[in-house]
Amino acid sequence: MSSTIKKIGIVDCNNFYVSCERVFNPISIGRPTVVLSNNDGCVIARSQEAKDLGIKMGEPFFQKRDFMDEHRFCVYSSNYNLYGDMSDRVMSVIKKYASEVEVYSIDEAFVDFSNIPDEELTDRLHLIRNEVKRLTGIPVSIGVGPNKTLAKLTSYIAKKKEGYNGICSYWTLQNFRNLLYTISVDEIWGVGRQWSKKLRKIGVDSIGQFVMLNDSLVRKMMTVNGLKTKMELLGMYCHPVKPVPKQKKNIASTRSFGSDIDSFDQLAEAMYSYIKNGVKKLEDNEISPNRATIFIAGNRHKEEKHHNSKVVKFESQTRDVTQIWSQVYPYLRKMFKEGKKYKKCGIIFHEFMPENIEQGTLFSNTVQLVQPPVNVEKNWEMRQEYMSQKFTTSWEEIPSVFV
């Protein structure tokens, strides 16, 4: 391998949400296991055992409940506090053994291994995989190639093809071009559902067929980004690893309610709760917003399809809960309509400034402070009938060990 060729890897957690649950609920190991979306609506994560039994992503839970009972499934409500914390732990282990790491998603990280000598690369990959498993309990697959697109592809091969044991390097693959004809275009990094449909309409079903297309046709169908994808599949380098995360354009805190509500007090308490959750995200990112969009909406599956939103400009950049609530409250009161039922609300913060140049004072004389809602019946809270404990983020729910 030439010293000038990039060695880009991706560390991908296997069935991440399910794996997080299995770390603390070993009873689910070996049994078909699923994690459900907000309000226990749809399947959003599946163990291999669940996949083998035909459970599909996005399937409504109520349609499969009896089937899952019959096959002794382990079912969990989504526990995002747990998943977020476990993700941080996985990423911290990866960063111990790699200098350039781009956290791509909650369960994936791109790594630039270009400074690792060729003869040491395989050992480094096994070290990372073993250490992540040992220190967090999360199994991962690792793919390495000369660019991000081929790293994603080799990661797919490491997961899906026999004989790789969770690690695949582009440079060790035999008959690579022939292998591309066995993999669907759906598995190309960055090729979404719409592009896949367009490609299939012209008879392109496999990656092997895709890379044989004329460059001008690819660019016309899929823009310059599609052409870059094709170039990377042919071994070129177009997308660098970016260790510094991009500045977030917005931070949202929204949820659907467990049941429809028609009380302003309940709506206000839900909005206040989401503001607090959003402020926690602002604090984690050390940024403060200048504006926020608040919205309330009816149930889109019923006749109550109404939706209302408002952009609130804060008097100064702030992430103080009381300040934000006091400026949001008057607009929320105006937006609420008696007799209407609501299924969802939320707040989206935007127009950020870094912490060190935040302007304004903590409490402005022109903002009349509003007390938060208290002692309100929480009919708005999400249904989470199968929620596991917050094993790593709550002292009250930390596992007990007896000796």
Go through each PLM region and give its residues:
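A glycine-rich phosphate-binding loop feature that marks nucleotide/adenosyl-phosphate handling sites
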Residues: P146-T149, E232-M236, S288-N299, K341-M353, ...
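DNA-contacting surface of Y-family translesion DNA polymerases
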Residues: E187, K197-K341, Q359
